[in-house]
C-alpha cells in the first residue's frame, strides 16, 4: 500500500489492501466487463428464456474468517431443454466447501460429491447423454487467475433449479486491524434479478464502526442506535441497512435493501474493531466423530512501547534498480543519491544488504547478500556512484526469480525494494509469481516519473504485502524513498515458530506414557510462517487428524476442569531478543464441538429439503467468547492451506502431490484444481429432446499481455513514453578491486565500471547549484553521510579533511581512543543545524549515530545525563 494512503477516510482505500490485488488483475485483463450469466452474442435471444432469477447470500463473519451460503435459482422458460455453462471469479482465499441442488418440486436436495475432475466430467457427460440432469462445479485458471465454473446440464423446459454453494474464506484485512468483506461486481449478472444479502458479524471485541462502499458511494453505517431497528433512519435508497446490534456492539446484523434488483458496482464493508488485542487469539474445533482437532491462531500486534533506540531487529535488504536507457539523466542521478542515503541508514550487526541493477540483463554487486559493515558499505558506495542507465530494456522477471531462488533466512526477513520508471513485459505473470512468495519476501516498489506502469507498481508490492510510492516530483524524491524505508524498519516479529511441546505439559496425566504424544501428527499450515510485520495480521492453522487416546484424555480434562491448554509462539523480537509468547487454547469456553463428519457435505446423497441446513447458522457448541463458525470451518481452512503448501512444493520442487491433494479435497469437501463437485439426477423419464446449448464459458476472454500493458487507460499516468534503449556514453573507468571484496559478483568484479562523462558533468553542475542553496556550508548532506562509518560514527581524520571545526572535547572524551565519540556528536549537531528541511533523509543515519554514542558512553560508566550534556555542548559549538 502507499504510505500516503493509510487514512481510513481516503477514497477507495480498500483498493490499497493486499486482498484486492486479485480483482485489480481481473479488471485489467478482462477484455470486456461481462460476468455471471451474461451471454455471448450467439445466445442473446436465449437469455430471455434462461436466466438467474434469484440470488441470495447469507454470510457470517467472525474475527478471522467468513462463511457464506450462496443460493441461486435458475429458470428455463424456453420450450426445449437447456445446457448452460458460466464462470465467476474465485478469489485465492475462497474455498468452495459445499454444493447442493434442489429440484423444482422440492422433494429432494441433492448433495454434490467430490471426485477427481476427469471422472466427474465423464459422469456429467454420461448422465446428460442418457437423458438425465447433471450439475458440475469445478475450478479453472485463465492467465493465472482462478475461476469457479458451473455447468447446468439438461434443465427441462419450464422448470427451475436451486443451486446452493458454501464458500469459506479468511476475512480480508487492512490497516489498523480492519476487517474487509468484499463482493466484486463481476460475481453478478448484468441484468436485473432478485437479490438479497444478509450478514451477521460476530466478533470477540466490540465494533467501533462499519463503512459501506458501493461503487463510488461511501456511507458510514449507523450501528449505535437502539438494539433493534438501527437502520430506521437510513434512506430508502441505501444499499445496506443495519437491522440489529447487541448492547456491546459485538454482534451486528446487516441486510441489503429490499428494492435492490441488480448489483452494478462492487460492494465492500470495512469493519473497524474498537479494540485491537495485543495478544494471540485462538479458535478451536473438536470433531468427536472424526476424532480430530483443528486450531486457528490469529495475531495482530500493535508493537506498543517499542522505542526506536531500543530496536535491534535483523533484516535483509535487496535493492533492485532499473538501469534501462530511459533512466538516463536526472532520474538516475536522483536514484543514486537516494541509494547513498539508504545504505547509510542501515545498521551494523543487524542488516544484510545487496544491490542488483537490471535492464535487458541484470548485475548483482554480491553473489549473496553481505553483512552490513565498513567493507560492505565502501563497496556499495563505490558501485552506486558508478551506476549508469545503460542496460537496455526492462526485463524484470529474470532478476526477481534469481533473487527469490535463494532460500529465505528466517532470522533475516527478506525485504526487496524495486525502483523503476517504466513498464515490464509479462506484468501479470510477474505479479502472479510473486503472489506465491509472500511468505518469503516483502516487496516495496517505487514508480519513478510520469510514464510508469501504475498496475505494475501496485501489483508488485501488494502481491507480497508490501508498500509502494509514485515519485513524479524530483524535489521530493529522497523524501518519498525514505518513507518506505521507514516502514521497512518498523517493529516486527521474525523467525516465528510454534512450540507444541507445552500442549502436553500442563495436564494431570503428564507423567503417564511421557512421550509427548508422538503418535499425534500435528500439521501446521502454512508450513512457513511469514514474519509478523507492523500493521499485519498472522493467521496459522494446526490440525491433528487422528487424536491419540492420551491427547483425547487431555482435551476432555481441559473441557471438564476449565483448564486451558498452552502452546508457545517463539520468535525474534524487535529488540533483538528471543521471545516466548503463550497462546491459550480454552477448550471449555472457546471450542466448537462438532458431531458431524468432515466429509458429510461432499458425499453423494439426498435429503428432504427441510433438513437442508444453513451454512451461516451456528453449529452446536458450548458457550463461546468468540463468534461461532459453521461445522468444520477451521478444519477446512486448515486443509485448504495444506493443499496450498502442497501445490507450492509442486511448483518449486516439481513434485507430484496430486494424490494427497485429492485425498484432502475429498475428506474435507474442498474444491481443488484436481477435483470437482458432481451431482447426478437420474430421471425415470429421460429427456429425449435435443438440448439448446448456451455457451457462456468464454465470457472472460483476455487481451494478450502486450496490448494489455500498452492500454493507456489501464497503465499509464500520461501518454508520454520513454525510450528503453541504452543512451550512448563516453566512458572513463573506475575499478572495484576483487582481492578486497572476494564475494563481489564475478560479472561486476571482472569488468571496469563505466561512468558517463556527460552524466558526471551534469551531476557536478547540479551539485554545484544545489550547494549554493545550503546554509553557508560548502558541502552537501551526502558529503557528510558518505564518510560515516557503518556503525554510525565519524572519525577525526575524515571530518578534518572537510574543514569542520571540532573544538575542544570534554575532558572525559579527550583521549585518542574516545575522541571519535566527540567528533560524532559534533557532526550530528552540524547536520541537524545545516539541513533542517532534510530530516527525513538523515533521520535513520542520525539515529544510528546516537545509538552508537550512547553505547560507547555506557561503557565508561558515566551518569545517564551525560549524553544530553555532551550534546548541548556540541550544539553550542555549531
From Swiss-Prot:
It comes from the Eukaryota. PROSITE patterns: VIT, VWFA. Pfam families: VIT, VWA_3. Gene3D superfamilies: von Willebrand factor, type A domain. Residues 624-635 have a biased composition (Polar residues). Residues 595-638, 752-774 are annotated as: Disordered. Residues 595-623 have a biased composition (Low complexity). InterPro entries: VIT, VWF_A, vWFA_dom_sf. Residues 36-169 form the VIT domain. Residues 316-496 form the VWFA domain. This is von Willebrand factor A domain-containing protein DDB_G0267758.
